[in-house]
Amino acid sequence: ATKSNFTHKTKNISRLVLTDTATAKTVAIDGDTLSVKPAASLHLVRNGAHWQTASPAASAGLRKEHKLQGPVNDAFMESFLCVTPTGTPFHAIANERAKQEQDRFAKMFTREFLGEARAKNDTAITGADIAANNLILFGDPGSNQLIAKIAAKLPIKWTKDSIVVGDKTYSAAEHVPVLIYPNPLNPKRYVVINSGLVASRGATAYGDYAVLKVAKQADGQVTGTVADEGVFDETWQLPSTKI
C-alpha cells in the first residue's frame, strides 16, 4: 500500500478495521475500489458481494473476535470457574447428565493437569467471579440460578418443556443443550453450559453448540447422543444456513 492507496484481498471475513489510514484516499479490496476520507482507522463491511465503509457504531454489538470466537474449548484457555447447581432441576435425568459431565471434567483436569478445577456453588457466585472468569455452568434453569439469569438472552431457548434451536424443538425432559456464548452478564467473558474440555478422553467434540438426547444406562450412567450441533455465526446467533 502507498500512503493514499490501500489494496487488500480477503477470504472468509465480512468486516475489518484498517489502521494507519490518516492519509488514505482509496481502498481496493476484493475487486471493489472505495473512495474514503482519511482517518486514523477505517471500518469496512461486506454487504452481499461488495465492500463498503461503515461507522464504528455499525460494528458494535456481539461479534466473534480473538478470545471470543468459540468453540467450547476456547473457554478453558483463560481463567475459568465451574459453577455447581444447588437448586431443583427441571428434569432429573438431564440434571444427572450435567452432574456426571462436571464430575468427568473434574477428574480429567486432576489427571491431566495435576490440580483441581476451581468450582463454586451457583448461590455463592459474586460480581468479582463474573468479572474475572469464564463461567462453566452445569445444570439447567431450574437447578442453576446463573443459567436462569441468562437463559432468555441465549440464541437457544430453554424452558421446562422444550429446547428450541431455530425451527427445531426438542423435549427438555430427554435432551440437554451444550453451548458456549459471550456471558450476558459480562460479554467480555464466556459462559459454557454443561461441558468441560471436549478434546479429552471420554468427551465428545462439539462446535459452539449441541443438543444431546440423554438416556440412562443399566450401569447408572447417563449418556448423551448428539441430536443437533453447529457453529454460531459471526454475531453469535444461529446462522440462517448451517455452518
PLM regions: where:
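Surface beta-strand/loop "capping" patches
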Residues: 1-12
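Solvent-exposed alpha-helical segments and adjacent loops
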Residues: 7, 15-243
